Amino acid sequence: MVVRAYEERDLSGMIRVWNEVVTEGVAFPQEELLDETAGAAFFAAQTHTAVAVDEDGHTVLGLYILHPNNVGRCGHICNTSYAVGSERRGQHIGEQLVLDSLKQGKAHGFRVLQFNAVVESNTHARHLYERLGFTQLGVIPGGFRMKDGHYENICPY
């Protein structure tokens, strides 16, 4: 597996993985699925978008987007979102994406990486972030509406 900046040829695989996570309704705040046009614009608008691809470089296993979390005096803080295809979860792809995003954030002049909306029940992500040295900043009670309509806490890191 290799993590690299995305290329146009990756878009269909990226959209597939992104939409899978959106459809699951338990991790991303987005509700609208991306089509090819919207996906191309969305991923291009990020400060950095990267993919994890298999050794042949053609199959997208996961991805992340990186962008400013705020502006002005807080513009040195970035935010990321990670997505790994369900068939490849549990293979440390997410960890490689997080580690690459830390390097890319620094390369793009950011000093801090903040995760805004980690759903409390997303124990795999929370464990990974804590293992990599991130600290939970608090709890936003009922901050995330799950696909089935109930609300869960958000744990920013």
What do the PLM-derived regions correspond to, one by one?
Residues 82, 140, 146-157:
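Terminal substrate-recognition subdomain of acyl/acetyltransferases
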Residues 105-118:
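Conserved GNAT acetyl-CoA-binding A-motif
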Residues 8, 27-87, 98-99, 104:
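Acetyl-CoA-dependent GNAT
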Residues 129, 134, 157:
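Conserved active-site tyrosine of GNAT-family acetyltransferases
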